[in-house]
Amino acid sequence: EQVSSVEVRGWDYTQKKLITSTANSEKVVTTTGNGQGSNSSNKFNLSQPPKMTVVDKPVFSAKQAEKMAQALCDELGGEFVYADAACEGNPKIRPGKIVNLKKIGDRFSGKYYITEARLTFNQRIYKTEISVRGLRTGNLFTTLTSQVHLQPGQTFLVGIVTNNKDPEGWGRVKVKFPTLTEEHESNWARVVALGAAKQRGFDCLPEVNDEVLVGFEHGDIHRPYILGGVWNGKDNPPEAIDDTVTGGKVRLRTIKTRTGHTLQFIEEDKGSSKKGIRIETTAGHKIYLNDSDKNIEIETSGGHSIKMDDRGRSIAVKSTGNMSLDAKGNIDITATGKIKIQGAMINLN
């Protein structure tokens, strides 16, 4: 298990970027005439010396990845030699200490890091037995305990959308997995959608460069599914969390497109934001169904408006320009009170 380097890859969702760190040299102090563990991986004269890439250990920062890469490199590098020895009893020889073994040949003389030590006293003989196993113990439990390494398809992966133009028209997308490789993209991945069925469902494909969570059918990385998009430190939710949540309850439920078209369900009043439903386009056209004030307002970005007010029992129609009523049939105007018509000039035909 000797490698020339150990690379740890992870995903920093606070910055929406890859975390990677590589350790090229172990810091374990066991050294012999053969050098260190990372050197032995180069003795086979391979065109590319073996290296380890770790993608199944979640890390949250570059510093954490650096420490993990170095720790794994130290662990592997310390195992390039196994040794057992016995000597006259000495309580100073214990795990974590270094012993210097001499006169056992150029290849084996050197400094050894003690993994285990046992002191025995038998028949008036005081003896210290040591084992060198790197940073792992050499007991039976450790030997028989297999290390679990999940294959990429056996867990969820972060994906970055690279293509959403499905040639079959099935609404699939392709992604790259930054923690695995920055060069390759996935097979076409089916997108999990609300109410998806024949010519129905919530059609909202992720866009290129969106971060998504990807699962795999039967653990096969060649059969990916997009489970949903996720927010991160660069791609924030459409509304500030202080406006969305009040006292542990979700006050706003918002659907917002890339260009700014918004559909918002307001569950509780807060300031000028009243309970109801609000629709607004990027250009500023608005429809507001206000349950708290018991009215409906329709307003254009240019200032034309209609307000139907149940509380005031009134309807107001305003225009910043001309207004016309056109009917193919009759127009009836009836009021139980007065009808007032006012203008600079009134023409009746």
Where are these regions (language model features)?
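Glycine-centered loop/turn motifs
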Residues: 1-3, 96, 251, 273-274
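An acidic/polar, Gly/Ser/Thr-rich interaction patch typically located in mid-to-C-terminal regions
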Residues: 2-140
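Intrinsic-disorder/coil detector with helix-boundary
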Residues: 101, 313-349
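Short, ordered loop/turn segments at secondary-structure junctions
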Residues: 117-119, 231, 330
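Hydrophobic packing positions characteristic
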Residues: 123-134, 139-327
